[in-house]
Amino acid sequence: KLVGLERFRHAHIHELSGGMKQRVALARALAPAPDALLMDEPFSALDAITRERLYDDLQRIHMQSGKTILLVTHNVREAACLADRVILLSPRPGRIREEFRIDLPRPRDITSPHFNDVKRHILSLLRSAPAEPAAA
C-alpha cells in the first residue's frame, strides 16, 4: 500500500511499467523494516514524469516513516528535491569536498525561489570543482 500498487498485487513482473518496477523494488527494500535505506541512482533510467512521481512517493514515505535514506545521485534537481544533507565528492580519489544542509520544508516545492537557490548553489559548487584527469 505504501507504494500505491495494491491493485497490481497479482500482476506478473512483465506487466509492470518501469516506474511500477521501481516502486516494487522500493517496497521490497522497505519490507524488512530497515533502519536505513540505501539507494544508488534509483531513478536514472526513468522518464521525467515517472521520476517526478517517484520523487513525491519517496518524500511521502520518508515523511511517514522517518527512515534514514542514503541516496547516491548525479542529478542536481534530485539532490535538491530529496536530500536534507548533500555531500559532494571530489573526483578520484573520492573525498568529501563539500557538505551542507538543505532546510526546505517537505514536500519540496520545486517551483519555489528557495528550491532554485539550492539548485544554483549545488551547480556552482560542481562548476568550481577541478576537472577529473582524463583516463590514460
Regions picked out by a protein language model, each given a short descriptive name:
Residues 26:
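Hydrophobic anchor residue at the start of the ABC signature
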Residues 11-14, 32:
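Conserved signature/switch motifs of ABC ATPase nucleotide-binding domains
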Residues 67-72:
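Conserved H-loop
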Residues 37-40:
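Catalytic Walker B motif of ABC-type/P-loop ATPase nucleotide-binding domains
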Residues 91-121:
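Conserved beta-strand-loop-alpha-helix hinge in the C-terminal portion
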Residues 51-65:
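Helical segment within the ABC ATPase nucleotide-binding domain
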Residues 1-8, 60:
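Conserved ABC ATPase "signature" region
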